[in-house]
Amino acid sequence: MAQVINEMDVPSHSFVFHGTGERYFLICVVNVLLTIITLGIYLPWALMKCKRYLYANMEVNGQRFSYGITGGNVFFSCLVFVFFYFAILMTVSADMPLIGCVLTLSLLVLLIFMAAKGLRYQALMTSLNGVRFSFNCSMKGVWWVTFFLPILMAIGMGTVFFISTKMLHANSSSSVIVSVVLMAIVGIVSIGIFNGTLYSLVMSFLWSNTSFGIHRFKVKLDTAYCIKYAILAFLALLPFLAVAGYIIFDQILNAYDSSVYANDDIENLQQFMEMQRKMIIAQLIYYFGIAVSTSYLTVSLRNHFMSNLSLNDGRIRFRSTLTYHGMLYRMCALVVISGITGGLAYPLLKIWMIDWQAKNTYLLGDLDDLPLINKEEQPDKGFLASISRGIMPSLPFL
């Protein structure tokens, strides 16, 4: 109750997005045309132009964000990735798999380092009210949360799953059913633990190393909460999987019976068309289940994350009020209508989604009460730092 009262006593500022779908649509059309005309060379400039438009039109507490990266800043990095891509293809086509594997592993080893450097560069080139964001972390921590920890968790869950299979017996039909149910439960819980734990640790690590000017962000997520909703999201998918699986299995049996008993070509064609129709229905049910599960998980984790994010020892807090149904129908519209229109509706629907997310995201407090001072930091120099700029991960809401 005290937390509610405290939040009601402080000013609340919702994020406001001033962009329009029509303007963003024109930007995307021009970008696509220029990218085609230049045979892909303009792509870095196109991507940065879109991001600058989105950032420049996002406002909070009366101030708009600024994004200072241009296509020229990341062009060299893109060239390096193109070089690696064609080098790997050439080694594979030249029947030199060993060299191809070495190049691929080299790129993967560098990728985590480059992602951390790229995230730092993105943060430093993003500002609000003239104050830059910053991201500083140890590479040991990055390797732990993004590489070693997932591998150790995967090995641990694989071991548990293997031991579970050895402990179960399938001496009768009833024991087979019990074994399948228990293995499904173990699998669902394992996936939930893996996803929930990783989300909690990765987000806590990223934002605990992020600052706004001289002020640090803090976030302490409830790992049990994240695991719970990761499991519930997967459970929400199961009914759709069951229905889609039943339809597919039924069609496989029908196809087998038809191949045995049907002799008429016209009858075979009709049965084939009917099978294709039901297969499409099964796929649509499956994809809708994915949308339901994804929207549920996204909203649950985002709202939890925002409610636990703070700046300057809690003087500035955040809140998210996204809803499951709001995310679901916007996500479905983004995929379905964009697909039907060949991508033409995507810019309009993306702006619609961003505007809704902004209206349901709040800053609790007043940034003007903080000393708005920049850290004395500059983007990293050197070859590795330069090629890392094309790795463009971004912190949520940055």
Curated annotation (Swiss-Prot):
Tell me which parts of the chain lie in the Cytoplasmic compartment.
Answer: 1-24, 95, 164-175, 250-278, 355-398
Pfam families for the chain: DUF898
UniProt protein name: Inner membrane protein YjgN
Keyword annotations for this protein, in alphabetical order, are: Cell inner membrane, Cell membrane, Membrane, Transmembrane, Transmembrane helix
Source organism of this protein record: Escherichia coli O157:H7
* Top-rank taxon, per record: Bacteria
Q: Which subcellular locations apply to this protein? A: Cell inner membrane
Cellular component per GO?
plasma membrane
**Cysteine pairings via disulfide bonds:** none
Task: Report the transmembrane regions from the record.
Answer: 25-45, 74-94, 96-116, 143-163, 176-196, 229-249, 279-299, 334-354
Q: Does the keyword tRNA-binding apply?
A: no
Q: Which residues lie on this side of the membrane: Periplasmic?
A: 46-73, 117-142, 197-228, 300-333
Q: Which gene holds the coding sequence for this protein?
A: yjgN
Primary location group: membrane
Protein's membrane topology: Multi-pass membrane protein
